[in-house]
């Protein structure tokens, strides 16, 4: 039987300025895991296009281009375009479990359906995928485990970025500036 409801969106006509710069975040495939979007659309842009609204925490799957096969839970409510498939599972299925399953299967899905990186994924391809589900409590426990791991990885990425920034600052301040003979910061015990 059906495990979910799925739909894609669309893009408002870019030639009509009043469809853009509104209050609805416009989520594109590279932004499925982001809490902000580069573009936003207006109510008029939404109603005059096939863009579709999704709630925060909706399972999103990238169908086209370089991001094909990327999966995430939306961090914001917004509208999606045609390059994204929203997947809304029935009550006995966990979004987190499906997200992690799709993440794990990404390379085999790409290899099978996008030979040589050509073409696009589609809702009908996703509907044909076979997922073996444990009980809902086990799905939720598995999903939560990987969500915790993802959060830890994100924290480590932030720590690494901060450390790289600090290194750049020290490199800049511990080397003499142009026209200077001594750096702004010196190690203790060194002078001259």
Residue ranges of predicted features:
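A short glycine-rich beta-alpha junction/loop motif
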Residues: 14, 78-85, 103, 115-138
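Amphipathic alpha-helical segments with low aromatic content
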Residues: 128-130, 134-192
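A short beta-sheet element
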Residues: 22, 28-30, 37-103
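Short beta-strand/turn micro-motifs at beta-sheet edges
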Residues: 70-74, 114-120, 173
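Short, solvent-exposed loop/turn positions at domain surfaces
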Residues: 13, 47-48, 148
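Non-catalytic DNA-recognition/assembly elements of restriction-modification systems
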Residues: 1-10, 35, 186-192
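Extracytoplasmic/periplasmic mature domains of Sec-exported, cell-envelope-associated bacterial proteins
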Residues: 107-108
